[in-house]
Amino acid sequence: MARYIVGFLLAIGLIIIVIVLIVHGVSSPTRQPLNLNNDANTNTEVQFTIDSPISAASTHHDIIVNVGNTQSSIVITQGYDGQIDSLQTYPMSVNAYTIFLRALMINGFTLGNNNPALADERGHCALGDRFIYEVLSGSGSDLEHYWSTTCNLGNFLGNIPVIQQLFETQIPNYGSITNNIAL
């Protein structure tokens, strides 16, 4: 008799769990966007990359702007293996970096769709540009990685034109450096 009562209670418990899951749905916890406002005094860096259309390695280029609390840099690479064509660095102060990070936060730099199906930008918008928005730890690993394209694809939810211009203005002669790069 005791077995029947235990079995009955387990069955009722399972029914309640199934009903709760159906009503509330099964979902993974929502990841909160990073708060960059506290990162100006750390080794955290932010990076914006323009990945040109898919083409022969000899004509493919990336423009990478990296900003940290001591310097900003622009790297032009050729091909798909990160071969550096040019690199220029500029001094950055903690105060300037603090304001820059705040501007990025206001314009949604850390907002994106975390759907795993959208995690990898490679191959998307093959004939257009891919824009990659990253927050990097002091060791260089991705803390956050979002992307958009000229084909209106991607998982980045921030203000694309403002974010791009904010990064470009961290490089004093951005226009002359990138003028001859075919994107």
Regions found by a protein language model. Give the residues of each.
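Short, well-ordered, aromatic-rich surface patches in folded extracellular/luminal domains
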Residues: 2-7, 13-55, 117-183
